[in-house]
UniProtKB/Swiss-Prot annotation:
Residues 578-600, 747-784, 963-994 are annotated as: Disordered. It comes from Saccharomyces cerevisiae (strain ATCC 204508 / S288c) (Baker's yeast). The gene is DUF1. Signal peptide: none annotated. One of its GO terms (cellular component) is cytoplasm. The modification Phosphothreonine is found at T693. The keyword 4Fe-4S does not apply. The keyword Phosphoprotein applies. This is DUB-associated factor 1. It comes from the Eukaryota.
Length: 1116
């Protein structure tokens, strides 16, 4: 089943200070020959694309001023290796609109990048994808004398070849064609339209899959086609060539949408490079075995058969290593980069006397020019003298005869001046290489390419520590900072593009943390942290990361409700379109235009009585409130930990009941919600078994153990993500670059329920039937993205408005909000920006496909945010509103642009993108504040008295039997011996507390040493109270409370009303347990078995306040 996940990447503190440096090797160097502009771009394995202004293009010597100046733009575009990059060269494009590029990546995405004319800000959007790593992208040329027909057009417009455009496809509509190839064995042909939206259309898919599951595409090159024969009786009826992993060269025609020629086994191994030369008359290809071939692309027809002959091989050479990159446009002047780090200049115009000259040798240049930097890069290697030089990933020649190239072993950009053979290096940064999530599920230990170990906090998104190498290896640091706090997994962490990423899936709300673990965080919403209360860690993280986004949506929701309320009652009789007041642009009539969400700036609201038949169409629900909406609204009525502080009283320690009944709030007989719930119970299996009905206990009642509950938890119904349609037909339009399909259908007046339909719902029979149809409708189309949730909310508001009585209308109260912020959830201050990603994980796919990504700045804290849950504790809907003072400009404060990130998007634009692309389950967790929590896994354990011999190491069935069949007296023989762990984990008691206990026990205190309190001198516990079941998150001190309460007689400490955590010890396998340790931690650290945990109890001796008082008085 397909799954949508949300991930966020932690931005390194030096991100903004190293705009001109990659942190992983550079994969592509592109010099776009744009008149009047001097800059080049680099893309890297760190997923970023850097625009370097003319710092490297000037022939003037570098000065200190030019060296210090940071004149580059770093664009974090991808979440995996950026593998290739092209410039979009459109005819008659507006220079003031800036420049456009397209990049492809190992994250399966094709991204359009727009840079403004001043080269100061940038923007991006996903316009396409593949099902595996994308390795290459090339623009498509065309023949000037032939029409180039697009599939979506009835007739292709005449295209005129323009030498300035270098033959790139343009037509009257100024479209741009390009192809992409990848490891999914597919080549996709795309058309990018002109205009501000720049929509990408998938025109055709070439399938190169072979019978032996091979055919991955590694390299491509465009060809200027020649479909008719010239005077030499030659032609080129193809417009690009691809090289695959089998060594085949495949020539395709985008005009005719077919494979024209295939040269099988053109190389023995996979092809690394294909490049057309000399105006597409020659082709050079290289393979991983070091073979270099040159082909003549002027094909001839066979005189006898008339078939098109294959391109002729006119030269072949062998090099001692694989050629990874080729730079040049003519055979007489080429530059090669090989897998050993050498750069060669080649002249292959004379095939009998080919010349290949090595102009760069890594040993010589590294020793002479950058010896210190190289040693620093390899500081973590075992032998600093052993230097490994990787291959050359890419080469680019600038107009000033400077050759740029990159190694696969570092992130440096190397510059070789061909005029004076001067070599220099622009040093790159350092990237993370591995990570380990600690058991507290909040801290992560990482290692970077510099050999440094660091500790990160994934809740506050900050770098906590950078450790010196003297503190040990990576594993040593992990062991040192692994605490005894062991929590269940709520996320997974990984290192991608040199950054630390945290992936959240729909089960992230299953982990809770005690308030004592949050004391070091800065809470910004005035929530008082209770150290003994449990908080949902996943909810804390998402509410802290998206705090400002939530406030933005709350404000938009309030403006929408004001607009709805501003309608007059008489307008209900007519079909009405309500503008929410956010629209700043006129709506387009293009049917394929990207749809906005229901709360988006250009959204509209339609309400009215249009369905006179009283029977709504099958595509629309027949109930005034959707089933999902009713369920979600009722959930906060359940008792849970998020509604109240978790009660640690003994009343929650009780036996497991034999049966449980569904829990529902009592409704009046005339309540619509009551009848709806009755209909759900009778028609929906989900309502009777999943939402409010706890799981039935298993086993026989006499053997049922006691249950120690930490809270009143109810199972939570999780809305599983539906499979998304794999929309890969021809002419697929990527109007919305972040979606797989159109997620929202147009809301027409015919789809809305009428008043007559609502009146019929007053009968329980029709309500029951309509509930069934509603559930069936939901099964047909389950929500996937946040606009689906916003549509449900808007429909609910319309129903509230339509059902509002005249009396309520006169009270001037807004409809009740459906966006509920987490009022009891602490909001943590996030210290840095994050890279937010939305992935689609298809069943059977090799990885996740990126649907959306954006840089999210940390939330600003203002008065509204600091008030936190106060707004939700008393919603503003109960206040009267002035309809004449509806302020539609409340969102202006979100127009702030974070210049340090380099993006041209302000916060409002970022939030609108999030609104379009966040998964439904994630948005529901943000805005619905569901009060039910996941039922904690329960563990079985036994409590038995501690024995000074053997401990619980030999505890098992025999010890259990001995304990159960023990004599009525539990008085010990008075053994005064104690093991070395007696004092471990005991808490110190202040003198004032000791004096308090002294006053309590000054009467009836034992006077002789024979009656001194011993570790085993404790009352017995009845057999019925020995076997227990408790949630894994229960603390040891609460188990102590239960143990003391189940003693058959009271101890002196109990008579003194001392807390059991002060005088009672619990042990597991001889280890004294800390009071704050959870039962999960005990099982993981000490018990290390799947069987019932055996805990032993005894009295503390040395640190007991009561013992101190007794001994002190005896000495007087």
């Amino acid at each position: 089943m397909n799954q949508l996940t949300v991930s966020y990447g932690l931005i390194s503190p030096d991100y903004c200070t190293s705009q001109d440096a990659h942190i992983l090797p550079i994969t592509k160097i592109l010099y776009p020959d744009i008149p009047g502009k001097n800059y080049f771009l680099t893309s890297g394995r760190d997923g970023s694309i850097i625009l370097h202004k003319n710092t490297q293009l000037s022939n003037e010597p570098e000065t200190a001023a030019t060296t210090i100046k940071n004149d580059a733009i770093r664009m974090q575009v991808h979440s995996d290796w950026a593998s290739d990059l092209i410039h979009v060269n459109m005819k008659n494009s507006d220079p003031s609109a800036g420049d456009t590029f397209i990049s492809v990546s190992h994250d399966f995405s094709i991204v359009l990048i727009s840079v403004n004319a001043q080269l100061t800000t940038w923007d991006k959007k996903i316009i396409g994808d593949h099902d595996d790593y994308i390795k290459c992208i090339v623009p498509i040329h065309y023949e000037m004398s032939n029409d180039y027909e697009l599939e979506e057009q009835e007739g292709g417009p005449d295209n005129v070849h323009d030498g300035i455009n270098n033959g790139i496809v343009v037509d009257e509509q100024n479209n741009f064609l390009f192809v992409t190839g990848g490891l999914d064995r597919k080549i996709k042909l795309w058309c990018l339209s002109s205009g501000p939206e720049k929509m990408a259309t998938l025109l055709h898919t070439f399938d190169n899959a072979q019978s032996n599951d091979t055919g991955s595409i590694y390299s491509m090159s465009p060809i200027i086609p020649k479909y008719s024969f010239d005077d030499n009786q030659t032609s080129r009826p193809f417009d690009f060539v691809a090289g695959d992993c089998n060594g085949d060269l495949i020539f395709y025609s985008c005009k005719y949408r077919k494979e024209v020629i295939r040269i099988q086994n053109a190389h023995r191994t996979n092809i690394k490079v294909v490049r057309t030369l000399d105006d597409s008359t020659r082709l050079i290809s290289t393979s991983s075995d070091g073979v270099i071939n040159v082909w003549d692309l002027n094909c001839r027809h066979d005189q006898t058969t008339g078939a098109l002959q294959l391109p002729k091989k006119i030269g072949s050479w062998s090099w001692d290593s694989s050629i990874w990159c080729v730079q040049g446009t003519s055979l007489d002047k080429l530059y090669f980069g090989d897998s050993q780090g050498n750069v060669m200049r080649a002249n292959l115009s004379s095939y009998e006397d080919a010349k290949l000259t090595r102009i760069f040798k890594p040993d010589h240049h590294h020793h002479h020019h950058h010896h210190h930097e190289h040693e620093e890069q390899n500081i973590s290697t075992t032998d600093a003298k052993v230097k490994k030089y990787g291959g050359i990933l890419d080469i680019a020649l600038l107009p000033n005869e400077k050759l740029l190239f990159s190694f696969c072993t570092d992130s440096n950009l190397n510059v070789l001046d061909l005029t004076n053979n001067h070599f220099s290096v622009n040093e790159g940064g350092f990237a993370l290489t591995r990570s380990s999530l600690l058991t507290n599920r909040r801290h992560v230990i990482t290692e970077n390419t510099k050999g440094q170990m660091q500790r990160w906090d994934i809740v506050s998104c900050e770098l906590l520590n950078t450790f010196d190498s003297s503190e040990g290896s990576f594993d040593d640091i992990v062991m040192k900072y692994t605490s005894k706090e062991i929590l269940s997994h709520w996320c997974t962490v990984s290192v991608k593009v040199g950054m630390l990423f945290v992936k959240i899936n729909p089960k992230f709300l299953k982990t809770e943390v005690y308030g004592s673990a949050l004391k070091d965080y800065q809470v910004v919403n005035n929530i008082e942290i209770n150290s003994d209360e449990r908080y949902n860690l996943g909810k804390i993280v998402i509410n802290s990361l998206f705090n400002e986004f939530i406030s933005y949506e709350v404000q938009k929701d309030k403006l929408l409700r004001k607009k709805i309320f501003s309608l007059k009652k008489k307008d209900l009789t007519n079909s009405l379109t309500l503008d929410t007041g956010y629209n700043s642009e006129s709506k387009k009539n293009n049917k394929d235009k990207k749809r906005k969400s229901t709360f988006k700036i250009s959204s509209t609201l339609s309400i009215g009585n249009t369905n006179s038949s009283g029977t709504p169409p099958n595509s629309a629900p027949a109930t005034p409130v959707m089933a999902e909406t009713i369920v979600l609204e009722e959930q906060p009525l359940l008792q849970s930990a998020s509604d109240k502080a978790i009660d640690d009283s003994l009343e929650l320690v009780q036996p497991l009941p034999a049966s449980k009944k569904p829990y529902f709030r009592t409704q009046s007989s005339g309540s619509l919600l009551s009848r709806k719930f009755k209909s759900f119970r009778s028609t929906s299996g989900r309502a009777t078994t999943g939402l409010n009905t706890p799981e039935e206990p298993k086993g026989i009642l006499p053997d049922t153990p006691h249950v120690i509950n930490d809270d009143s938890a109810f199972p939570q119904a999780i809305n599983t993500t539906q499979q998304s349609k794999d929309a890969t037909p021809e002419s697929m339009l990527w109007n919305h670059p972040f979606k797989l399909e159109q997620k929202l259908s147009a809301i027409s007046s015919q789809d809305l329920p009428s008043n007559n339909t609502h009146n019929k719902l007053r009968s329980s029979e029709n309500s029951r039937a309509n509930s069934t149809s509603t559930l069936e409708g939901n099964e047909k189309k389950k929500p996937e993205f946040m606009p689906d949730l916003l549509e449900q909310i808007q429909e609910s508001y319309k129903q509230q408005y339509m059902n509002t009585s005249s009396l309520k209308y006169l009270t001037k109260r807004l409809p009740v909000t459906k966006i509920i912020k987490a009022s009891s959830c602490p909001i943590i201050r996030v210290k840095s920006a994050t890279l937010v990603l939305v992935h689609l994980w298809k069943e059977g796919s090799c990885g996740g496909r990126v649907l959306f990504s954006t840089l999210l700045p940390p939330s600003h804290v203002d008065n509204e945010t600091v008030s936190g849950g106060k707004e939700n504790s008393k919603p503003p809907d109960d206040e009267e509103v002035d309809l004449q003072a509806v302020d539609d400009d409340k969102l202006g404060k979100y127009d702030l642009i974070d210049g340090e990130l380099g993006s041209r998007l302000n916060r409002r634009q970022i939030f609108e993108q999030l609104e379009e692309n966040l998964p439904y389950w994630f948005a529901k967790a943000l805005f619905r504040d569901i009060k039910t929590v996941e039922e904690q896994p329960k563990l079985n354990f036994l409590i038995m008295p501690w024995s000074s011999v053997g401990g619980s190491e030999a505890a098992g069935n025999e010890n259990k039997k001995k304990f159960i069949s023990a004599s009525d007296t539990t008085e010990s023989s008075g053994n005064d011996s104690s093991d070395s762990s007696l004092g471990n984990g005991n808490e110190a008691v202040s003198p004032s507390t000791q004096q308090q206990f002294h006053n309590m026990l000054k009467f009836g205190r034992p006077k002789t040493s024979e009656q001194e309190l011993n570790p085993t001198d404790l009352p017995r516990i009845s057999e019925a109270n020995v076997k227990l079941v408790a949630p894994g998150m229960i603390r040891v001190k609460k188990i102590k409370l239960y143990v003391a309460d189940r003693f058959e007689t009271k101890t002196p400490e109990m008579k003194a009303k001392m807390e059991p955590s002060l005088w009672l010890d619990l042990l597991c396998r001889g280890q004294v347990l800390d009071n704050d340790m959870t039962l999960n931690t005990v099982r993981t650290l000490y018990w290390k078995s799947q069987g019932d945990i055996v805990l032993e109890y005894r009295r503390k001796v040395h640190n007991s306040p009561l013992v101190h008082e007794v001994n002190g008085n005896e000495g007087k």
